[in-house]
Regions:
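Short, charged phosphate-coordinating catalytic segments
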Residues: 2-35
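Gram-positive cell-envelope targeting signals
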Residues: 11-14, 87-93, 149, 154, ...
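C-terminal secondary-structure termini that scaffold catalytic or DNA-interacting sites
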Residues: 24, 39-54, 61-63, 83-84, ...
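Generic structural detector for well-ordered beta-strands
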Residues: 30, 56-58
Length: 213
């Protein structure tokens, strides 16, 4: 939901099935609720971060298929729920997210106590290998991932695909267009070759071919 729809963490954890329209000709979801916690207890409100947060987002086919399979097995009104069908507490979310981060190849340090002495043990996981302490864990991520990174990747992919800034702003739920444009400029023109072509084309239209001489 972060990678394919650009939802914020609070929007993902507050999403209910009544806002997921998988049977529509073009499946989409509506962002209408937000999750937060108070003393580790989940609270889901109809009040969103900003007016721009209220939006309808197309659901790409791979995610739509995944959501259909999930919905068939779900007895909760929430898309992401705990074993009781309730929204996740902060601790439950952290535990769930750790399932993903343990698959990262990021170097990590463990502390052991041997004969009362603290010993630091550092490991550097190798992509594709199984974890020594748990053979069910395969290191499949060569980067450290956060919910915000998934959302940022969604926005970046839209920009790379040529989606116009105003549409990106709407889909991302940005209240301020400056936020969108800052990302747009950083992504779109971070490549010197692309930037050179843009500048040359712009100046050629004004000064003619003399700009290339």
């Amino acid at each position: 939901l972060g990678l394919y729809c650009g939802l914020r963490r609070e929007e993902i954890l507050g999403l209910k099935w009544d806002c997921v329209f998988l049977d529509a000709q073009a499946p989409y979801l509506s962002v209408r609720r937000a999750w937060h916690t108070e003393h580790n207890r989940p609270v889901v409100l109809d009040e969103l971060k900003t007016k721009a947060s209220r939006r309808d987002i197309p659901i790409p086919c791979p995610l739509a298929d995944c959501l259909r399979a999930t919905k068939e097995k779900s007895s909760s009104e929430f898309v992401i729920a705990n074993s009781d069908g309730e929204p996740l507490s902060y601790t439950q979310f952290q535990r769930l997210w750790k399932y993903i981060t343990t698959r990262s190849t990021k170097e990590r340090t463990y502390v052991r106590y041997i004969n009362g002495q603290k010993i630091r043990h550092t490991i550097t996981p190798v992509l594709g290998e199984k974890a020594a302490h748990n053979s069910t864990v395969i290191y499949s991520l060569d980067f450290q991932v956060t919910p915000h990174q998934l959302r940022h990747t969604y926005i970046t992919n839209l920009i790379y695909a040529g989606v116009d800034p105003k549409t990106v702003q709407y889909l991302a739920g940005h209240e301020n267009s400056k936020v969108t444009m800052d990302i747009y400029a950083k992504v779109k023109y971070n490549n010197p070759d692309v930037l050179s072509a843009v500048v040359n084309n712009a100046l050629s239209s004004v000064y003619g071919n003399s700009v290339n001489s």
